[in-house]
């Protein structure tokens, strides 16, 4: 079965039996449930819901079903067309809408699509809100509008420009310094909306560029997750010379990775680290990332006199913690930069503009900038379990076992994370598969993998 229902929305592959995949019936059900939740929450007096989508092949079909359903629920639809996730988030607040639906499966392959649900602040629903939507959908507890109260449909394609204008207006985005640096970059926008909005951003910043996979066809030229194993094309292009750096985004442009001028990966974990270092040098303060992100952010934060706090995995958890500790910047180690001066959402446009500002100020090569940060390596493993395994009980045992050791700090807000003086390991159960994900970090990849495998054996011995 490839239909996954979660607190953040619904996702699945297109085509196949009803109930097993993302099909029009389920799209109607969950869109109706979301509209019912928004109406009952009473958080906004607006009767408008924003809809934006990435360039996936199925996007037009899904968008039509979503928009028709919202109108059937009595909501006016503001369709902003092909738009990034952060653009859609901003459109909610800029238009004063009651909420928004983003049609994107993020980094998943071309056959996938999804509905991501926003509140009136343009932020993802909390776990409690998401569960409420799931409950409404399960009961099919919704009423449609009568013929005199159907919603209206409007299109507005100005939000890309408004998004870019908001980025250029940020105090720490030094447009003049970037223009004077005369950067030339190569961009892989993986045949989606990055190919629509990033040329406009780079033009505004005076950056020369070459695009790979720039046509927003939705027919992805390679696996769309911005990991080194998928980026051979742009890495080879950088190795030819003539570029200052490479820029890679995922299909909905909330994840961002850089490539050094020599064709080597900057490291997706270091996207946030590098941007945070620049922001903290100008506006000292606190930072937040999730438990599975690199320790380098903590090091950089403490260097600037701030305090680092870890949050549970998931954007809504990170933004909630950022508000709690008044963080000046935060995000996730997968290349997600959250800068509250812009908005509380991962935004690759903000990340690009801040990174280029930093590079222009420092006057160094991207590889030299990368070498200035603490060097850590993250290993990723998984423990396959039987469906009958009590994962929670195993994690409790791990917590109790290592909680007795004085040189280990145990965190259990999201699985179990064990922080050692010079390394860490994080065990998280999957919500969709009988597995435990094991993330570990150390000063070498060998040490990181060794630590991860050690904890894997501990878990196997407990079964």
Regions found by a protein language model. Give the residues of each.
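Gly/Ser/Thr-enriched, mixed-charge loops and adjacent short helices
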Residues: 13, 113-239
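N-terminal small/polar loop signature for handling phosphorylated ligands or for N-terminal nucleophile
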Residues: 36, 48-112, 200-259
